[in-house]
Amino acid sequence: MTYSDARSELWLPRSALASCVRGVMARDTLSVVLDEPQRYNHMPVAPTCALLWYLRGECQVLAPGAPPLPHSPRAPIAAATLCGPFTRPTVSWNPGPMHAFMVLLMPDALAHMTGLDTAALLDRIVPAEEVFDADWQALFTQVAQADNDDQRVALVEAFLLPRWQQSRPASALHSHRLTDWSRSVALRAASSGLGRSLRQAERRIKQWTGQTQRNLHGLGRSERAFFEGAQAHQDGAVHWGDIAQASGYA
């Protein structure tokens, strides 16, 4: 993998949206010249959903498992899309310069605000116009027409905040850690509705997040291993056995 001087930015949500928005990202390659390998985007397994705008340029998603090579099969996506949770890594490619803007949403928050079936979005990228009502489509238009990314962040927060305040569960957890979030979802699933059996709770988790509790636990463990490894690298003492034990792998 090669790197470039392209602009990449990350915004964390305000505290009132912490249990709804995972983060906001922008990628802008309009001012740099990238070679073929640098125009591939490698996205990891993700429990989140995403609102994705291609403000300039295009994106083509490679077939699952295809290597980042010119002959690999690929398909273009719309300029404005909803990405569901992904259970596998995803590779995409930009034919030329691009400017993309992405809002990562917790899947249960998206379901509460829109009524969408998150499970039906698993491993899918869908044009926004096919799934959202007029209010949400108006947001997509406003974000696309904004002057800069800071304005886009402000538009998204102003749109989401009243909707999340109205629809959020009373026990939604203000945490950016996947382990904390998945435990909060499991607790709400176990105490919601008339039926409180284990099977019914698991069905609610799948309905709200698109994934099983076991998968969410595994993603949380992977995230913790990443943070443990990053801290160990910063401290100059990486001991993989200790990292595995601290992350629940040993």
What positions do the PLM features span?
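Short, basic, alpha-helical segments at the C-terminal edge of helix-turn-helix-like DNA-binding modules
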Residues: 217-227
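Residues within the DNA-recognition helix of helix-turn-helix
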Residues: 204
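Alpha-helical bundle regulatory/interaction domains
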Residues: 1-198, 208-213, 227-248
